[in-house]
Amino acid sequence: MADKGLLLVLSGPSGVGKGTVKSAIVENKVFPFEYSVSMTTRKPRPGEVNGKDYYFVSEGRFKEAINNGELLEYNNYVGHYYGTPLGPVKEMLHEGKDVLLEIDVNGAQKVREKMPDGVFIFLTPPDLHTLHLRLEHRGTESEDVIRGRIKQARNEILEMEDYDYAVVNDTVANAVDHIKAIVDAEHVSVKRVIDDYRKMVEED
């Protein structure tokens, strides 16, 4: 009955598999939603497509977006800027479409400040050893950078209490199933539908 779309925020430490889980949701059409493409100043990784995975832009263009108030949130992570364009998110939610954001932990905190009605999911690894192996498997960063990411992951995991749900990414299939269950439940939660039913009673 609700007209407004659901904002779903998928976050977690670097290397936990946010992008992989997001891709599985998209490719398998697990539930209908619009994916909000983030903007970044980092270079594309192998296989990443501009406009699909990220909008890859220069630092100058990114700072222009900041100054113009075009971003819902942004952050500088390991020397690169990441941000979420605000306009498309607001437009899609207004049209009643569910929107999926895949962002880092700092970004998720900023989104919660501006859009507290969103559903915030923390994607966590089974353990830190598994996270270390996943970062090594990427083959894109030095051991020093990986150690830094693991250290940051420890701190980020302790911030899980600020989220609505925690999903362990032991396998992509399991993580996707849990996220779908969360979305299904949120669509019928009383806090999201109560206003519609109040209107129904008043109009009868």
Swiss-Prot record:
Keyword vocabulary terms for this entry: ATP-binding, Cytoplasm, Kinase, Nucleotide-binding, Transferase
SUPFAM superfamilies found in the cross-reference section: P-loop containing nucleoside triphosphate hydrolases (SSF52540)
An annotated Gene Ontology molecular function: ATP binding
Keyword Disulfide bond: no
Record's GO cellular component terms: cytosol
Location(s), subcellular: Cytoplasm
Catalyzed reaction equations: GMP + ATP = GDP + ADP
Gene3D superfamilies: Guanylate Kinase phosphate binding domain (3.30.63.10), P-loop containing nucleotide triphosphate hydrolases (3.40.50.300)
Signal peptide start and end residues: none
The EC number(s) this enzyme carries: 2.7.4.8
Annotated TM spans: none
Residues that hold ATP according to the record: 12-19
Entry-linked InterPro entries: GK/Ca_channel_bsu (IPR008145), Guanylate_kin-like_dom (IPR008144), Guanylate_kinase (IPR017665), Guanylate_kinase_CS (IPR020590), P-loop_NTPase (IPR027417)
Cytoplasm recorded as keyword: yes
Annotated ranges, domain Guanylate kinase-like: 5-184
Family per record: Belongs to the guanylate kinase family.
General function of this protein: Essential for recycling GMP and indirectly, cGMP.
NCBIfam families named in the record: guanyl_kin
The name this protein goes by in its record: Guanylate kinase
